[in-house]
Amino acid sequence: MADSDVATKPIHIMGAGLSGLAAATILAKAGREVHVHDIRTDSGARFDGDFQALENWSMDADFFQQLNDWGFDASQFRATEFQVVDLIHPDDVITQPKSDRVAYRIVERGTAEHTIDQGMKRQAIAAGVSIHYKSRVKEEDCTIIACGPKGTSAVAYGEIFKTSHPNHIAFQLNDKLAPGAYSYLIIVDGVGLICTCLWRKQSKSERFLNETIAWYEKHYPNLDRAPIKRVGGKGDFTINQRYKQDGRCLLYTSPSPRDRQKSRMPSSA
């Protein structure tokens, strides 16, 4: 096939998550015809109001400035900035690492208008991307594979609640509450999430979440929690050496230290 034919051939992407939408937007802005396929009904549909962190300390450049340089508008979704975190040690001692700039931003995942999923979706559509939901395609018919995890190496289980407590973040390393992993507390604009992540003993997630909630209520007596619902998810962590396979590009999600990852991660993350 001639190079000119390849350059004009429509690009099909499997997965309308953040990676798939970002790739589609850039390609569409470059003049390519792009079709994104997803088996779900909407971008972010596999999330349920989950909070995730976008870390901002591993590079000199601010991540939102990088987004802007890449042609994305971060004002299209809600993001709450933090410069400090409660770091809870295994012996329950709490220290507070601080940064003189934005250390990380909390975003919400899901189908609500203010989520990062919907913000990226709007920008993809504005760039001319055609998104096909409830669409099943074969990997061999796609140029880019961005469909998230297939395996499970960890599970996360949490409880969302209403609270009058001010915005706050806590990250805990305690193997008795989160075997092999970590737990965390996030509060943003009156909504909180306490979550435990399990690399081991995953069948006992209910027990570990209950014990984790009890720990936070004991050590943060002003939480003033009014439970809304419990949410769960799975995660998979692999060190991949390849970004192309059988002529198709593989997209991965770079991890945040407290991100409830459900995506495969590359070795350069």
Residue spans for each PLM region:
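Extreme N-terminal leader/targeting segments of oxidoreductases
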Residues: 1-11
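Glycine-rich FAD pyrophosphate-binding loop
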Residues: 29-48
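N-terminal FAD cofactor-binding segment of flavoenzymes
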Residues: 46-86
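Short beta-strand to alpha-helix junction loop
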Residues: 101-122, 203-204
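Predominantly flavin-linked oxidoreductase catalytic cores and closely associated redox partners
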Residues: 119, 123-221
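Conserved small/polar residues in nucleotide/adenosyl-binding loops
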Residues: 252-259
